[in-house]
């Protein structure tokens, strides 16, 4: 996999992120190289490979119906809201994959709380996060790539994944084999294979000088033995077939290898001579520059000593004035502290005085105002009227009660007389 060939270690990422910003006020910021601006693209590509190793397409994207991010999704600004939501979703999923319980963020959650929780989980893994949380609100940038890459590393560690060294394919050389044929080995077995092993490049080369010597020796032996006139008894058709069979095996191919140092020897010598010639001229310029710098430094040193000697009394006066200034500042700080305390006491006394004045004004206004007396008189008049009305009602009720009693008494007397008269009449009969 491509991620195995270009692995960015977490410590390297942390150093890169820490070098990209100052650690505090007054601290020197380390300048980065010209390629540091493109470092987050490399980190983002490694992050995509690690997410593929974690099978995020099946376990995250399809379940949440999300679109797979591009190889530079978090490195370039496209849609901040969508990128921030994707960042929070990926971070929560990676934290869960790393063995830590983490709730999946929702759209209505507070972004600051989500970022704070993610950074606290990142620090719990032992990773550094010394950048402001506002860097993650945009949803893109090197800090977003750094956080996701660290969480992906922790998730891979938790599942037991380890990076292996890349295995480069070995180029196999085509071995040219020559089939042995006992019918053709008539003279001293001239078709022997001579192979010379080269320990530098681990490849086999055929020694052409040996083949040439063998051919020359074969010709000499044949010329010595064949003194009489030879008569050919070979069939032309069989000879053609044999030539066609042996011809591919007689081809000697020597392949050039770019790794062989012999090809670059001439170029190395040319570069060496060029460097030596340039070094002679450059060395003279550098020697002259060194001498000039040395003389200038000596002049600067002597001038500095002269200035120090001339301004020594002024430096002493300056130090004395500096000491007096520090004492005056200290007295000023003490006096300023006393003034502040007295100002606070004055404000408290003024506040109490305002309260007393307000109370006095309220009491004076209540004493001089005649409105309460008028209200009391009106209430008394109203009470008298209500008393008169009540007396009248009581008299009416008493009169009505007396009339009812008299009427009841008269009715009772009439009833009594009515009952007595009939009894006397009955007695006369």
Curated annotation (Swiss-Prot):
Residues 335-426 are annotated as: pDED. The keyword Transcription regulation applies. The keyword Hydrolase does not apply. In retina, detected in the photoreceptor basal body and connecting cilium. Most abundant in the inner segment of photoreceptors (at protein level). Its main location: other. Required for the formation of cilia. Plays an indirect role in sonic hedgehog signaling, cilia being required for all activity of the hedgehog pathway. Has pro-apoptotic function via its interaction with HIP1, leading to recruit caspase-8 (CASP8) and trigger apoptosis. Has the ability to bind DNA sequence motif 5'-AAAGACATG-3' present in the promoter of caspase genes such as CASP1, CASP8 and CASP10, suggesting that it may act as a transcription regulator; however the relevance of such function remains unclear. The pseudo DED region (pDED) mediates the interaction with HIP1. This is Intraflagellar transport protein 57 homolog.
